[in-house]
Amino acid sequence: MDIKRTVLWVIFFMSAVMLYDNWQRDHGRPSMFFPSATQTAPAAASGASGTGATTTAGEAPAAAAAGAAPATTAPAAQAQLVKFSTDVYDGEIDTRGGTLAKLTLKKQGDGKQPDLYITLFDHTAGHTYLARTGLLGGDFPNHNDVYTQLNPGATSLTGDQNTLKLSFESPVKGGVKVVKTYTFTRGSYVIGVDTKIDNVGTAPVTPTVYMELVRDNTAVETPMFSHTFLGPAVYTDAKHFQKINFSDLDKNKADYVNSADNGWVAMVQHYFASAWIPQQGVKRDIYAEKIDPSLYRVGVKQPVAAIAPGQSADVQARLFAGPEEERMLEGIAPGLELVKDYGWVTIIAKPLFWLLEKIHGVVGNWGWAIVLLTILIKAVFFPLSAASYKSMARMKEITPRMQALRERFKSDPQKMNAALMELYKTEKVNPFGGCLPVVIQIPVFISLYWVLLASVEMRGAPWILWIHDLSQRDPFFILPVLMAVSMYVQTSLNPTPPDPVQAKMMKFMPIAFSVMFFFFPAGLVLYYVVNNVLSIAQQYYITRKLGGVKKKPA
């Protein structure tokens, strides 16, 4: 009857294990519990990131042929990479298809570490991630055709410019010529993409514009236990945010809205995302599919009204490629902030992040914001914690009497249980009275876990002294050691289980958890350390001042 703390530790441990196993399966890695098909190793792309590189996507499967964006064919003409630079991007546009083939996000470090650049789009021998467009509905220009840069000149955003425009013209195919224009704006992670379709033939044409993101299933390199969802996502007013697992695309079992006149499609990874955002109110079809052993795409197909000879049509869209900063995403498109995925705890996690952000706005340091948020949460839950610790204090007081009863009736379990129940009744103690207050707090605990895990704001954010990046593990393992010590102290304050096996398990738990926490992001471990220290202080105070009672003889 005295195993409630053991039960809670087991629940906590199993929750952590299941979270990790869920991450394993989300990223195409073998589950620890459920068998899965072996993932195919990423196929090497044939392009390189130098001049003349092309966007090779492999042959599309037969199922994707009808009405789908074309697969990449063998190059018929030499393509080039046009480099560009803005205050937030360094990138390359491949003239084959006018494809956005490389995009590096620039973020300045704090001077104590390298600048926090990350390459989002890329096309190398080991990794493919592209944003491309083209036309369907006839032998029209698509991403396999070599475009020509119009008005070659400055490709960098200078100090007195707010926008940078780069235009590319396709060859004439099927009586159609396409001019694709990228517009980069200072300080913005939203790229304007304008597709101008000129009918230079002698008959009307009715093309369809496709806009897609192509990516392999290679996991992003981040610290252990720091991964979230990786894969395509679709947002519509009808179904809101729908994640699509690569494994579902492998089996052709993906479930998502395939037609809408609103929303967006995206590729999501830890901390960063890209999304095609067509104009609202314009009908489009949505598709997501596997096009190579390790290559996938998600996109939209938007029909264009008939274009008479000598006339033209414009299709405008926006391409987001940047960090998953919640407030910024909310201002770009409805629902785009959902790419920062908190899973089933979103309803609790979003208010927690809002509060964390407000505290950061005051103190200006994410580490101290975590500390203050933890203190605030502990204050809110103090009545529940007090009830739990009072119950544990009472149990600790009567533990000697319980042990005496167990020893006296060890040969008669029924009499022993009856005597224990009578003792609980006499002393007005509920052996599980400390469990419910703790269980109620578990959703908040898990929600804050995901807040700290999913927030790109932690990336490169320093705290004090040796902690220069709250999204990375503690380089000297000081916080995990403090975590282990605090867990040991907290365990020692609890009633000692009468069962020797349970007692050993309680002593082993801090060691087991500390090993796991050695690989957690420093911001997450900081929360646990502060939470444990506050819990120890609360428990000590309540045990000594509020929950203390005089021992009675057995």
UniProtKB/Swiss-Prot annotation:
It is found in: Cell inner membrane. GO terms for molecular function: membrane insertase activity. Keywords: Cell inner membrane, Cell membrane, Chaperone, Membrane, Protein transport, Transmembrane, Transmembrane helix, Transport. GO terms for biological process: protein insertion into membrane; protein transport. Gene3D superfamilies: 2.70.98.90. It is a multi-pass membrane protein. Pfam families: 60KD_IMP, YidC_periplas. InterPro entries: Membr_insert_YidC, Membr_insert_YidC_N, YidC/ALB3/OXA1/COX18, YidC/Oxa/ALB_C, YidC_ALB_C, YidC_periplasmic_sf. Belongs to the OXA1/ALB3/YidC family. Type 1 subfamily. Interacts with the Sec translocase complex via SecD. Specifically interacts with transmembrane segments of nascent integral membrane proteins during membrane integration. This is Membrane protein insertase YidC. It comes from Burkholderia vietnamiensis (strain G4 / LMG 22486).
